[in-house]
From Swiss-Prot:
Region (G1): 19-26
Keywords, ordered alphabetically: Cytoplasm, Elongation factor, GTP-binding, Hydrolase, Magnesium, Metal-binding, Nucleotide-binding, Protein biosynthesis
Organism: Microcystis aeruginosa (strain NIES-843 / IAM M-2473)
Positions of the UniProt region annotated as G4: 136-139
Domain tr-type G: 10-214
Keyword Protein biosynthesis (UniProt): yes
Reaction(s) catalysed by this chain's protein: GTP + H2O = GDP + phosphate + H(+)
Protein name in UniProt: Elongation factor Tu
UniProt-listed PROSITE patterns: G_TR_1 (PS00301), G_TR_2 (PS51722)
Residues at which Mg(2+) binds: 26
Gene name, Swiss-Prot/TrEMBL: tuf
Cellular component annotations (GO), alphabetically ordered: cytosol
Length: 409
């Protein structure tokens, strides 16, 4: 029933809860929905509804993720919560649920744990730009000094992974106490209860500290080529989904990837067999290009605003390798393994030159189910950039999923 009043008039931000298992991420997610539901800005979700997260498939990998949505006075949020640690790792790497920012949940009673570190590292590697911290289970800590120590430890950990550890807002509270109070008093407002107030304080920090992301439509134009046709008398048409930006008839563009980059001009844009003046992010369109033969362009190239993307052959990637149960390989692989890397619309063969563990040590052998950093050299240059997702395939089946953490050349 309450569905209808979610009008998208406010800026939209994707966020998620991250942190160690059992530190209270799901309880916090439930507490946020209950608290904002009292203002009519969310649909209250119980812990069980979020915890029983449905399975999703992203790039051939099964992930359990719960999605909730809510509003604050200034924004509309889509919030993702993964119950299991493995689901988190997979979600972060596949980008199944993109995050513009995260709420790092740390138990004040336990302090940072190994998974806390791993999630902060992953957030850094896969490009979750900003974090806000919720020190949970404050009700279980009697000693103020202990709370301060945990906060210092968290700030130091964030700084170690290149986040602004000194500036990140840290809010202490108890998701469980807030949830219990809201369950008994579903109309409770700010000022009624200290634990509920901590949830308001957290959301105010998220509102002010996590910036509104630049919308795809405001970024420079890019479309990955999926198919190419010649139309007699009109020239060559490349079709695909416009990934970002706006393209207008008469715009100068570049064809990037696989071969030498070359300039051309857009002479027409078509959608659903109709001619348009412009195409924008999200559109599936056909783009007519001046002076380009059908043989000059192929799937896997991108058409982009001049100078905004370059072709590369070597990169570092953070990769999750599918387990045997997930349909991945049954056997390990080693240095100089040569699978295909599926980027945007095409497979490119590449050689894996080395593997690195989180602590920077070299790894010789990679097992199905591992998460690993790898250096890859592609046989053809293609338009890639930091933060892009890719799949690793072998004979057409996905055996791994990754994100580009650094462009080398």
């Amino acid at each position: 029933m309450a569905r209808a009043k979610f009008e998208r008039t406010k800026p939209h931000v994707n966020i998620g809860t991250i942190g160690h298992v059992d530190h209270g991420k799901t309880t916090l997610t439930a507490a946020i929905t209950m608290t904002l539901a009292a203002l009519g800005n969310a649909q209250a979700k119980k812990y069980d509804e979020i915890d029983a997260a449905p399975e999703e498939k992203a790039r051939g990998i099964t992930i359990n993720t719960a999605h909730v949505e809510y509003e604050t006075a200034s924004r509309h949020y889509a919030h993702v919560d993964c119950p299991g640690h493995a689901d988190y790792v997979k979600n972060m790497i596949t980008g199944a649920a993109q995050m513009d920012g995260g709420i790092l949940v740390v138990s004040a009673a336990d302090g940072p744990m190994p998974q806390t570190r791993e999630h902060i590292l992953l957030a850094r590697q896969v490009g979750v730009p900003n974090l806000v911290v919720f020190l949970n289970k404050k009700d279980m800590v009697d000693d103020e000094e202990l709370l301060e120590l945990v906060e210092l430890e968290v700030r130091e950990l964030l700084t170690n992974y290149d986040f602004a550890g000194d500036d990140i807002p840290i809010i202490a509270g108890s998701a469980k106490e807030a949830l219990e109070y809201m369950t008994k008093n579903p109309k409770a407002q700010k000022g009624d209860n200290e634990w509920v107030d901590a949830i308001y304080e957290l959301m105010e920090a998220v509102d002010s500290y996590i910036p509104t992301p630049e919308r795809d439509i405001d970024k420079p134009f890019l479309m990955a080529v999926e198919d190419v046709f010649s139309i007699t008398g009109r020239g060559t048409v490349a079709t695909g989904r416009i990934e970002r930006g706006i393209v207008k008839v008469g715009d100068n563009v570049e064809l990037v990837g696989i071969r030498e980059t070359r300039p051309t001009t857009v002479t027409g844009i078509e959608m659903f067999k109709k001619s348009l003046d412009q195409g924008m992010a999200g559109d599936n369109a056909g783009i007519l290009l001046r002076g380009i033969q059908k043989t000059d362009i192929e799937r896997g190239m991108v058409i982009a605003k001049p100078g905004t993307i370059k072709p590369h052959t070597q990169f570092e990637g953070e990769v999750y390798v599918l387990s045997k149960e997930e349909g991945g390989r049954h056997t390990p692989f080693f240095k100089n393994y040569r699978p295909q890397f599926y980027v945007r619309t095409t497979d490119v063969t590449g050689t894996i030159q080395d593997y690195t563990a989180d602590d920077g040590s070299t790894v010789e052998m990679v097992m199905p189910g591992d998460r690993i950093k790898m250096t890859v050299e592609l046989i053809n240059p293609i338009a890639i950039e930091q933060g892009m997702r890719f799949a690793i395939r072998e004979g057409g089946r996905t055996i791994g999923s990754g994100v580009i953490s650094k462009i080398i050349k």
